[in-house]
Amino acid sequence: FDSTMTRVTRAALIIAIFIGLEKLLGFLRQLIIARQFGLSAELDAFNAANNLPDLIFALISGGALAVAFIPVLSEYLEEKGRPIMWDLFSRVANLVFLATAVLSAIIAIFAEQLVGWQLGIAPGFGAPQQALVTDLMRLNLIATLLFSVSGLVIAGLQANQHFLLPALARSMYDVGTLIGVIILAPQTGYQIGPITLPAFGMGIYGLAYGTVLGAVLFLAIQIPGLLRYQFRWVPKINLRHPGVQQVLKVMGPRIGTVFFIYLVLIYIPDNIASRLLTGSITALAYGWLIMQLPETLIGTAIGTALLPTISEQITRDERGVFTQSLNRALRVILALTLPFSLLLAMVMRPLVNVFGFDLVGTEMVVWTARAFLIGLAGHSLLEIAARAYYAQQNAITPLWASALMMVTFSVMALLFSKLIGVVGIALANALAFTGEAILLLYLLNRKFPGLSRLGSTLPRVALACVAAALLVYFILSMSLPLPAFISAVIALAIGGLAVLPFVWPELKLMMKL
């Protein structure tokens, strides 16, 4: 048991380190984009153009299939060996690539109608902006086709307990998009010391071409991993193959779940935001980006590392070990996310100022990010709760939970956006996802008693929040002879250190995950 949990800890640390690198590169990319385009109609168009391509990836090869695929691949690897596992992988990958190609072609043909339709992507945009969305979306579909394969490669490598290259792939994607931002988009070259970088002057189109380049690098970096684990491609598609049917059985409900999540994260927010102030869609994108930094470092890293192991535990019918694994993960996530969400909200304005938005834009992003942070713990807990069901190859319960979440979010987003604008959409997101996480954990605890037994974790976390918040408030109120951004980072770091003594038991648990 201890060796298994240590393996999960190592994997989580690897994933967290490379997610941190990816987020650093992503932050740099978004910083440069903000300085180039601001909260502009062009950038709103680019963000809106990602919607349908992202949905195809999420439904077919990304969130829908990858999470459902790993438990089945782990079972095949455990019981039938690696060659049989890769045979199944090839059959599913061939099917997914074909389905993605067909859907991408259909969307490219009808892109103009999908953008301008009242229930479409951006009905609130004017005709020139809608035309720009159409062009950019067609370019992004090329990247989607590449991601249809690379998303499955991640599942194949993680089923083999290999996490390094899938984690590094995120950063390679950011390298490609950075090239788009720094070289392809600008009208004049960036100056780095004595070197002037070339500039292709593509404007917002440069970001789309950078996305395609990033998708190429995302796939290429993982090829050595396939070779290491003796991957052999099988040029076959067989829907009657028992493994393919097993994957599709789990994938069907998972597609519904991811579709509801897409509605909540992208379609409904952007549809509503396109009718609000210019820049609202981009404010949502930046607010979400800020919340996603700690969420992916904590929730995604732990959840991704945990899934192959808890899938093995279910295969071996180790219910007690499964329950303990999840309980430890939940306690660690609460101990880290609750204090961090509060402290990050307190230092938000100096952090957002570095993007260079005007006063109105800065306020939009600050309060949108703060609203998203209310759901940081909920989003992170959901990373664990959902994977606990997929480890059992149960995709029905998360489907119904996400459907309920979508309805709840829709009502709250419409109401809150009328009261407080784009911030209300982010607040609705936080409350809806937190409610979904609580529901799934409640149902899990009924099946696995003791799973949500938190002991003294919450009282100690509450004390940590109070102590750290007071300390950060004191530091921010001082007139330090430093730039506001540096003062905010120092306050955040000191506040984080103040949290450590209160959550030390959970930090020790993290090393045993």
Regions found by a protein language model. Give the residues of each.
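Membrane-embedded alpha-helical bundles of multi-pass transporters/translocases
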Residues: 1-513
